[in-house]
Every structure is written in structure tokens, then in C-alpha cells.
Amino acid sequence: MFELVDNIAQTAVIKVIGVGGGGGNAVNHMAKNNVEGVEFICANTDAQALKNIAARTVLQLGPGVTKGLGAGANPEVGRQAALEDRERISEVLEGADMVFITTGMGGGTGTGAAPIIAEVAKEMGILTVAVVTRPFPFEGRKRMQIADEGIRALAESVDSLITIPNEKLLTILGKDASLLAAFAKADDVLAGAVRGISDIIKRPGMINVDFADVKTVMSEMGMAMMGTGCASGPNRAREATEAAIRNPLLEDVNLQGARGILVNITAGPDLSLGEYSDVGNIIEQFASEHATVKVGTVIDADMRDELHVTVVATGLGARLEKPVKVVDNTVQGSAAQAAAPAQREQQSVNYRDLDRPTVMRNQSHGSAATAAKLNPQDDLDYLDIPAFLRRQAD
């Protein structure tokens, strides 16, 4: 018997949820810029703000807590509102393989609710990435502290986190830039990241990168960077790659030692082996020795001279923790007793000493080794041993 199998192409479902006022603006920006292949959701405690949202799905958080009037810049109110609606949050996220959470940190709804939404998504087994902004310095130290606390809470529940300091907008665009243009520039970072991931997953390539590769690179990786670059001309591969990894709006993160790197190259049929190699060589410069690196290529017949590069780098700024040294003084002393005679015997063997019984030789060597080991002047670690353990050993 032959069993008929439906030949339906399964593609990963990507959802973008904007939380609070800043997140709602980002979702509106993406919807107007025709970012395809994703579903948009907007969640807010302010019922009035949800009326002007272009997202297909809107979620009013915590009507019992806030009465639809917002969180009043209080993150705890935003948190309680999200906790009240955990079930509804899980309903709107149902079916997603990957979720982007975007918000402006420092306010009430975004700072308080975003970590709860991330927690729900992770419990559902969804790959969760957050793209957040930090407030301007002139907004006050208190708002900055609230933002930093929210970012730390969010980092505990997301797989990867991208941070955009609003201060960079002023540095890069200048004081004469319009406010709308400045915030649109920040929203472009999110739009570029989502569009890039969507293209990677949904567009089959000659050297294919699928959702499993994305999940491998981004799961449990912490700080991340996403960028896209486009260039044409004889040096297009190098220029596009450098543009992708040098986004001036992103938080100052050290690309050196990235533990996960995903690269997708999109070009016409004239893509050369040398250009493919140029992209790889630039990526290799900041990759960790043990990094997981995946490079995909899409050949688009409609592209002429342009070459697009999308780079996802994760695990940035990671530091290997030093292993905890557990000192057991009794075991340490016996190890020194066993190792010290063996080391001396390897250096010079006193054959006359062999006439003495082994137990006597070990006692004499062991007492000297123990005395040397337990000398506080020679080993400051000795002072870290609790006094009662030191007395037992002595």
C-alpha cells in the first residue's frame, strides 16, 4: 500500500509584537514599508493608542488593572497588566516559530510587559528575539535606570537581544534632523532585521539556510547584532559586508568573539567565487575560534549589479567564566604528598633512600610537602579555607 502525503511546503511563521507606544510605532513603520512574510501584533495598556495601529492583531493588556488608560510610566503596572493577560498573550503567539519583540525601554508598558511576553514565548518553545531602544540621556537618570532594569529582565527570557541607544540618533543624524526621520531610522533597524531573517528563511537558495540554522545561531546567545548591506561595482562584496556589520545605530558591542554567525548573500547569476570568498574572509575576522558559522547564497535572476548581504552575529561580548576552584585541604595535602616524591624521583633518584621502608619515606616526604603547601606565606589561597578546616588539616 502506498500512503499519499500532502506535498505542502512548510515555512516558518514569524510574528512581530510591538509593546507599548514605541513598539506600536515600530510596527506601524514596518507595515507601511511592506515588510512581507510576517504577522504583526500590537500590545498596549492604552486603549486609545491601539486605535491608530496598522497591525492585524491588537491586544489591550490588563484592562482590569489599567482600565485602558495606560501604565502611567510605571513598569510594575505594565508587568501586572501582562500577567493578567498571559493566556491571551499565548493565544496571539500560538503557531509562531519565531517572535520579534520590539519596544522602547524606560516607560511603563514596554519595560514591564515585554519581559512577561518574552517569558510566555519561551515557555511555548518559540525562538524569541528582542529589539529595544534605550532613552535619550536628557530624559533623566530615573528613566535610564528603569530602562536598564527592564533590559536586564528582558535578557533573561529572550534568545537574542538587540539594543539601540536613542543617543546614537543625535550623533549620526545631527540636531537638524526631524524627529520623525530620526525615529524612523531606529525603526529601520528592526525592519531590516525582520526582513533579513524572513528572506533567509523563506527564499530558497543555491546554498540554502533554513529556519533550523537560524535557531542554532540565535538560541540562548544573549547580545546580538543584525545588519544588512547593499553595494554595487567591483568591490561590492566587501562594501556590502562591511555595511552590514557596521551599523552605527546599534549599541556599542564588540563583534570580536561572536559565537554564532549567520550570513546570507543575495546576488545575480554573476556572483563570483572571489566575491563569495571576500564575504567569508571579512566574517572570519571577528568570529570566535569555536563559532557556529553558516553562510547561505540566493541567486536572484532579477538582480543586476547589486549584491545584498545580511549578517546575524550572536553571543557578542561573551566572557568565559572562570571555573570555581573548590579547595579540599585534606585531598590537596594527600595529592601533594603523592606528587612531590614522584616529581623529585623523576628529577634525581636516590638509590640509598630505597633501602628505607616505603611508609617511612612517604612520611618524611609527606610532612615536608604538607608543611610547604600549608604555609600561608606561600599560598594566599590558604587563607580562603575556613578556619575549622585549616585546624582539622593541621
Swiss-Prot record:
One term of GO molecular function: GTPase activity
Positions of GTP binding: G21, G22, G23, G24, N25, G108, T109, G110, E139, R143, D187
Gene Ontology, cellular component aspect: cell division site; cytoplasm
Gene3D superfamilies to which the protein is assigned, alphabetical: Tubulin/FtsZ, C-terminal domain, Tubulin/FtsZ, GTPase domain
A GO biological process held by the record: division septum assembly
PROSITE patterns, sorted: FTSZ_1, FTSZ_2
Compartments, record wording: Cytoplasm
Subunit structure: Homodimer. Polymerizes to form a dynamic ring structure in a strictly GTP-dependent manner. Interacts directly with several other division proteins. Interacts with the SulA inhibitor.
Assigned protein family: Belongs to the FtsZ family.
Record's function text: Essential cell division protein that forms a contractile ring structure (Z ring) at the future cell division site. The regulation of the ring assembly controls the timing and the location of cell division. One of the functions of the FtsZ ring is to recruit other cell division proteins to the septum to produce a new cell wall between the dividing cells. Binds GTP and shows GTPase activity.
Additional note from the record: Formation of the FtsZ ring is inhibited by SulA.
Name the record gives this protein: Cell division protein FtsZ
Organism encoding this protein: Pseudomonas aeruginosa (strain ATCC 15692 / DSM 22644 / CIP 104116 / JCM 14847 / LMG 12228 / 1C / PRS 101 / PAO1)
UniProt lineage: Bacteria, Pseudomonadati, Pseudomonadota, Gammaproteobacteria, Pseudomonadales
